[in-house]
């Protein structure tokens, strides 16, 4: 396959195109403030931000949660949705290579280094270890659910934007410009939100102790906060 860029390396024009990505994407959004959601803390993505937005203040909020809770939440989606992509990965796997019960095998797929949770964990670890980018805060999921008003005010203060009064008794599904998440592509409801009053949902997922032992204590951001 030919490398077109090397054939005509117009780097300045490509840089100009990339620098205007956010401006062009959000050009028709009717909003005073837009907080971009994405995997911006991966080492590669963060370098891109720093390269193309070096004249802007980059601030990142990192939503974190107990890793075992995340794993349990994903296993709960597996339990409720037979066609969920994690279940399908398991069903298509070579069963002659399987040594654990199904639930443990599903946990291994979810936590695999090529999947999302591991990507976020190594990105946080790299962020803390390199310590070259410091304009970020961690927001605990438990704080967001148990004391949302205080937590959101902290986020607004971090971004230096005015506070917005929320109705935590009337939480709605996320929708913007008439568009909602279409989770059928995943085979399960990844973004399904309990509408109405904001409160933590409890459910029980039993997994072998090996799984608990393996994925306990991975919340490295808490160790840093405790050291401070």
Task: Give the residues covered by each predicted segment.
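Short beta-strand segments
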Residues: 34-37, 62-64, 138-140
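PAPS-dependent sulfotransferase catalytic domain
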Residues: 13-27, 72-158, 219
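PAPS-dependent sulfation machinery
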Residues: 1-52, 84-102, 197, 202-205, ...
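A general structural motif
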Residues: 30-32, 55-58, 134
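Short, surface-exposed basic-aromatic patches at helix termini and helix-loop junctions that form
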Residues: 49-55, 153-158
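Conserved phosphate-donor/acceptor-positioning beta-strand/loop module used by diverse small-molecule
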Residues: 52-77
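PAPS-dependent sulfotransferases, especially Golgi type II membrane carbohydrate sulfotransferases
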Residues: 98-111, 121, 125-134, 149-150, ...
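Short catalytic/ligand-binding loop motif for oxyanion handling, primarily in non-cytosolic enzymes
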Residues: 42-45, 68-73, 145-148, 172-175
């Amino acid at each position: 396959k030919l490398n077109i860029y090397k054939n005509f390396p117009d780097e300045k024009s490509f840089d100009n195109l990339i620098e205007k990505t956010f401006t062009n994407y959000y050009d028709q959004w009717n909003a005073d403030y837009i907080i971009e959601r994405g995997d911006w803390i991966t080492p590669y993505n963060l370098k891109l931000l720093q390269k193309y937005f070096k004249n802007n203040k980059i601030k990142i909020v990192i939503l974190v949660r107990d890793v075992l809770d995340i794993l349990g939440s994903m296993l709960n989606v597996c339990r409720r949705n037979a066609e969920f992509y994690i279940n399908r990965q398991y069903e298509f796997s070579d069963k002659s290579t399987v040594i654990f019960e199904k639930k443990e095998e599903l946990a291994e797929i979810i936590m695999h280094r090529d999947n999302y949770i591991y990507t976020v964990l190594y990105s946080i670890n790299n962020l803390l270890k390199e310590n070259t980018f410091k304009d970020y805060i961690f927001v605990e999921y438990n704080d967001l659910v148990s004391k949302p008003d205080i937590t959101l005010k902290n986020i607004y203060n971090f971004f230096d934007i005015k506070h917005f009064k929320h109705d935590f008794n009337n939480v709605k599904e996320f929708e913007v410009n008439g568009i909602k998440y279409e989770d059928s592509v995943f085979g399960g409801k990844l973004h399904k939100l309990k509408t109405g009053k904001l409160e933590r949902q409890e459910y029980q997922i039993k997994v072998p102790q090996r799984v608990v032992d393996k994925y306990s204590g991975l919340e490295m951001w808490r160790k840093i906060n405790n050291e401070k």
